[in-house]
From Swiss-Prot:
Mg(2+) binds at D80, D122, K123, E446. One of its GO terms (molecular function) is dihydroxy-acid dehydratase activity. This is Dihydroxy-acid dehydratase. Functions in the biosynthesis of branched-chain amino acids. Catalyzes the dehydration of (2R,3R)-2,3-dihydroxy-3-methylpentanoate (2,3-dihydroxy-3-methylvalerate) into 2-oxo-3-methylpentanoate (2-oxo-3-methylvalerate) and of (2R)-2,3-dihydroxy-3-methylbutanoate (2,3-dihydroxyisovalerate) into 2-oxo-3-methylbutanoate (2-oxoisovalerate), the penultimate precursor to L-isoleucine and L-valine, respectively. Its EC number is 4.2.1.9. [2Fe-2S] cluster binds at C121, C194.
Amino acid sequence: MRSDMIKKGDHQAPARSLLHATGALKQPTDMNKPFVAICNSYIDIVPGHVHLRELADIAKEAIREAGAIPFEFNTIGVDDGIAMGHIGMRYSLPSREIIADAAETVINAHWFDGVFYIPNCDKITPGMLLAAVRTNVPAIFCSGGPMKAGLSAQGKALTLSSMFEAVGAFKEGTISKEAFLDMEQNACPTCGSCAGMFTANSMNCLMEVLGLALPYNGTALAVSDQRREMIRQAAFRLVENIKNDIKPRDIITQDAIDDAFALDMAMGGSTNTVLHTLAIANEAGIDYDLERINEIAKKTPYLSKIAPSSSYSMHDVHEAGGVPAIINELMKKDGTLHPDRLTVTGKTLRENNEGKNIKNFDVIHPLENPYDKQGGLSVLFGNLAPKGAVIKVGGVDPSIKVFTGKAICFNSHDEAVEAIDNHTVREGHVVVIRYEGPKGGPGMPEMLAPTSSIVGRGLGKDVALITDGRFSGATRGIAVGHISPEAASGGPIGLIRDGDKITIDLINRTLNVNQSEEELYRRKNQLEPFRAKVKTGYLARYTSLVTSANTGGIMQVPENLI
């Protein structure tokens, strides 16, 4: 066993003394059992994580029952909804790297035989997944699960995105103070990740198709008995996988990455999943070309439109058959998935999901009646995005195929929000928000406030927004993010000027400004060099090492230092 490194031999008597002091070893034979880390992310201020201590206790009990010894440790967590709109959002994406590094540190320092990961919200799941692939120790994931959808006094289904859009509507005077406060009190009624197809739930659904989580991981409610039983079954499965030496890199292959994007397309997942999945591919040593995403989109139908793109919540998806029903439907179309891949169940993706039929055709559409014949995400290329940009086409009004408008430029999120709120932004504008990428932000903050204000003011079809920053999974509208290279790295988004005509072509998947190559070159020579906004602390170190979104926003040590 891997853990023999710290518990076998006379020279490890001091280590054994310390292990006895933990109280985790109940019997003399326990030293001969596998040591299993529980990588938890319990934190009081994040509603998606307040219940994870209880879930970890269930996992501990089941791991012991299965014949192994559990040791729990914790990671940090950031709630993107609470961190939104201020310096806290600068720390959200960078927290992914801290989580990955912290988990790697504990796992490798103590030679665990397996790891039970309990994530839930936005950056925690991908951070833990980066650690799982990096350490390549037998692992399984079981998230905390989504919260129930809220309900307004008028009986309208609510999610957190409803609340963000209500801010814009309230500023416009289109909803009353009473209705506004009612929504605030009822949008998030239970613990769990936010109820729509936002980043947390997108990633937790993708864990199923990647093969590192059990079926229904992405949709079973946080407060359900099914979630607690899933924790138990995942613990039993992990101990079996330790015995059989099934490791993350046996499961995370290029085919698995392709299938993750296919499910993302079918469910209209968050654009952040592109960022995280590219980072995971990089960690697994897979050189993944962004162009593959468009190829996958072309052959993957859009089957389930979930909040914020509809009123359906994750619980509605669960009741309609969950991710297994969507996977089963996609498997009926040859070439869409790679169903004979290994998963943590010890079975193939096909064996896990075959025969799991759709129970509600309003929530999950069948192959013969998709929302769209192509997937809900697109990667755009052009003279504004030589290395790509991402748009959630599933969140764009279906009538919009091409949008051309005049640029109105802002060098920060806050400047843009102020201009939208004071009506400087008008119909026909393309709002350009730059210097908000991984390096420029720093931290690639989410642009949920400006997009929500645009939609809340009723301009969702009349104003577009492009940025080298990113979006919340709750974003909808004509919103193009992840533009690469970012402005801070000399990308052409930094060369746009007010009044330039910008065209977003969803049919041809292009993003262009109507300026010649010569003019853009002239502007680049006049550009002031980027200077880091933060000079001290973690964000300063992050700025010096992070790359643009087309790589997944990973941190790379310069080649001359390796």
